[in-house]
Amino acid sequence: MRTQWPSPAKLNLFLYITGQRADGYHTLQTLFQFLDYGDTISIELRDDGDIRLLTPVEGVEHEDNLIVRAARLLMKTAADSGRLPTGSGADISIDKRLPMGGGLGGGSSNAATVLVALNHLWQCGLSMDELAEMGLTLGADVPVFVRGHAAFAEGVGEILTPVDPPEKWYLVAHPGVSIPTPVIFKDPELPRNTPKRSIETLLKCEFSNDCEVIARKRFREVDAVLSWLLEYAPSRLTGTGACVFAEFDTESEARQVLEQAPEWLNGFVAKGVNLSPLHRAML
């Protein structure tokens, strides 16, 4: 039997770079919120212990795909602790709607959905803490998707505090470019010393993203989309880009602006949600 699992997008409602560690990783403070929009992952169980991704991504080797890596990591971790039923395997496919290099967390969300779904389907019984710890080895954003609640993140993104920001409507726009995270983090002009503040203080301040100035400078497409959106509503970059978003109080307001969008702007309207659609589906 084939089952389907949500793999939602996320937004960084704010993102501040507070420093850089000796190993090169940047420390940050950011606010994650999910969207009721994303990819859909389909899983059909196998009994021969094999993992197959039926919808390969162009330019990404099968074993390098985060979906396959997540499945194999769960398989190994569960097997090593005697919690993997004999023959556990899966055929996995994905209906991909989230762009790569968009700052919406698509790859991290895919990995988290596979960890959570296969742990359930295989009946491994790993805890949420164990899954989140495994997820961190796949990517800094994976744990927040595993835990499934909007969160204030610190460190390199792995220290999570659940929060409940307002669930607004967003017009999310893709400028048509892909921005690899290292391009932003290696830029010498990236702010790296924003003072650390408490979550209480940050929630009272106007939200912004330290990466935005670099993305706008290096990618004129990002600058053009943000300039257009800012005429209608508070707007900013998510993650390291390339996607940007404008926030609205109602769905109709967001859709009215999208209807006025120039032809070169690709976007969608979605609601911010504090409980991940993946975890809502499991209730």
From Swiss-Prot:
Its EC number is 2.7.1.148. One of its GO terms (molecular function) is ATP binding. The keyword Nucleotide-binding applies. It catalyses: 4-CDP-2-C-methyl-D-erythritol + ATP = 4-CDP-2-C-methyl-D-erythritol 2-phosphate + ADP + H(+). Keywords: ATP-binding, Isoprene biosynthesis, Kinase, Nucleotide-binding, Transferase. ATP binds at residues 99-109. GO terms for biological process: isopentenyl diphosphate biosynthetic process, methylerythritol 4-phosphate pathway; terpenoid biosynthetic process. InterPro entries: GHMP_kinase_C_dom (IPR013750), GHMP_kinase_C_sf (IPR036554), GHMP_kinase_N_dom (IPR006204), IspE (IPR004424), Ribosomal_Su5_D2-typ_SF (IPR020568), Ribsml_uS5_D2-typ_fold_subgr (IPR014721). The active site is at 10, 141. Pathway: Isoprenoid biosynthesis; isopentenyl diphosphate biosynthesis via DXP pathway; isopentenyl diphosphate from 1-deoxy-D-xylulose 5-phosphate: step 3/6. The keyword Kinase applies. It comes from the Bacteria. Gene3D superfamilies: 3.30.230.10, GHMP kinase, C-terminal domain (3.30.70.890). Belongs to the GHMP kinase family. IspE subfamily. Catalyzes the phosphorylation of the position 2 hydroxy group of 4-diphosphocytidyl-2C-methyl-D-erythritol. Homodimer. This is 4-diphosphocytidyl-2-C-methyl-D-erythritol kinase. It comes from Escherichia coli O9:H4 (strain HS). The lineage of its organism: Bacteria, Pseudomonadati, Pseudomonadota, Gammaproteobacteria, Enterobacterales. The gene is ispE.
